[in-house]
Amino acid sequence: MKTLWAEISCEVPVAMVDLLSDFLVELSGNGVSIENLALDTFSLETVEDSPVKTVKAYFNGDSPLGSQLDAIETFLHAHGSAFAGFVFKHPVVATIKEEDWANNWKEYFKPVRIGSRLVIKPTWEEYAAGEGDIVLKLDPGMAFGTGAHPTTKMCLEVLEMIFYGEGPYNGDGKHLDPVTVLDVGTGSGVLSIAAAKLGAERITAIDIDADAVSVAEENLALNDALPLVAVSTTALQDVPGRYDIVLANILAEELVRLAPELVDRTAPGGYLVLSGILTEKEEFVINGFGGFGLSLIERRREAEWSCLGFRLESK
């Protein structure tokens, strides 16, 4: 017997998509999708095509949905007014078969180039690599990112620039010798995979979500990167040592809360790359990392998101 799922759809402004998606993932315990786009798998050119998107969450179709619908409507009323163009609409409920929910999102995940060299491709898509391409194979599952979201994309761009000494990162165009990398909030593992393929000699990847760790391990194995990466649910304060590059793609409030530990894990002269920051909270994060001996060397922005690149003073 095929499992039936209840699909609850909510129409919101583009800027509210991430906030609502996080809430729905927590409420449902499952992945979400966006109309005509799978979460975190869109082509970047489509972000501004429409002022609104339909976010869809999935619940067990055999259980009553009254409490979930009430929670969603309360959330929309509480947060919607903060977003330009928000008009409250009642969520729409539909019933779908499990195989439709599990596979339809894949048709929207295509190979995407990030930076000058990196190409991310799903495992089910063919891609003819060009000269100099560094191909990352990914099978993210519905609840984890693919690298196309601006927060992850900017991290990947900065990571490539660091390894190749481009822009504000050394600026000499020389490839770094093997380095150590700490990936905080690894999710699908895409940043760790990129670091391994760019030449890191040792990588530590952590995430508070055990499911994310499992997905990351599978993706690392797909890319023959698992021997280089220790991935676990270890808390940041329990990670030993210091790293040449520290990457943290998490919410602004968490970045500031973890600022002392993130700086403590950064080697003198090393780079600290922070993403997951709404542009309106950029100064909040910069101020939160003041007084630690960091130099802000780059502010990168895309859509409503910011990525900050710091260098820790050598001692």
Swiss-Prot record:
Keywords (A to Z) from UniProt: Cytoplasm, Methyltransferase, S-adenosyl-L-methionine, Transferase
UniProt cross-references to Gene3D superfamilies, sorted A to Z: Vaccinia Virus protein VP39 (3.40.50.150)
Enzyme class, UniProt record, top EC level: transferase
Nucleus among keywords: no
Source organism, top-level taxon: Bacteria
Any one Gene Ontology molecular-function term assigned to this protein's record: protein-lysine N-methyltransferase activity
Listed GO CC annotations: cytoplasm
Span of the signal peptide: none
GO biological process assignments: methylation
Keyword Methyltransferase: yes
SUPFAM superfamilies registered for this protein in UniProt: S-adenosyl-L-methionine-dependent methyltransferases
Reactions listed under catalytic activity: L-lysyl-[protein] + 3 S-adenosyl-L-methionine = N(6),N(6),N(6)-trimethyl-L-lysyl-[protein] + 3 S-adenosyl-L-homocysteine + 3 H(+)
E.C. designation(s): 2.1.1.-
Annotated S-adenosyl-L-methionine binding sites: T152, G185, D207, N249
Transmembrane segment boundaries: none
Cell compartments where the protein resides: Cytoplasm
Main function: Methylates ribosomal protein L11.
Family the entry assigns: Belongs to the methyltransferase superfamily. PrmA family.
Name of the protein in its database record: Ribosomal protein L11 methyltransferase
Lineage per the UniProt record: Bacteria, Pseudomonadati, Thermodesulfobacteriota, Desulfuromonadia, Geobacterales
The gene coding this protein: prmA
